[in-house]
């Protein structure tokens, strides 16, 4: 089964090719209670040049390299519904920061 370290390695190799400043893992993989069917949940802090098309390409590349469905959230926390933001903030882990 894929691990947090595996996800971090792939994300750290892929994201430098995109306008992403930070990536946070949340959900079951961040909590350590993932199942064989779990998807990978990421919250990305993107730069201004990130388009929906590029974001779609990024998600496909991550899914191919990780062998799992990847759900990406790009809204800043202050723009999220409070209940959703709280659930993310409880377990999110920063797994990438652009240099």
Segment roles from a protein language model:
Residues 41-44:
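Short beta-strand->loop micro-motif that forms the acidic, two-metal-ion catalytic signature
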Residues 1-24, 30-36, 47-99:
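Catalytic core of pol beta-like nucleotidyltransferases
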């Amino acid at each position: 089964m894929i691990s947090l370290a595996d996800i971090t390695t792939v994300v750290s190799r892929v994201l430098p090719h995109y306008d992403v400043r930070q990536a946070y893992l949340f959900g079951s993989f961040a909590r350590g209670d993932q199942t064989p069917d779990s998807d990978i949940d990421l919250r990305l802090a993107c730069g201004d040049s990130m388009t929906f098309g590029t974001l779609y390409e990024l998600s496909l590349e991550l899914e191919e390299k990780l062998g799992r469905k990847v759900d990406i959230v790009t809204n800043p926390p202050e723009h999220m519904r409070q209940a959703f933001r709280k659930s993310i903030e409880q377990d999110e882990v920063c797994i990438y920061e652009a240099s």
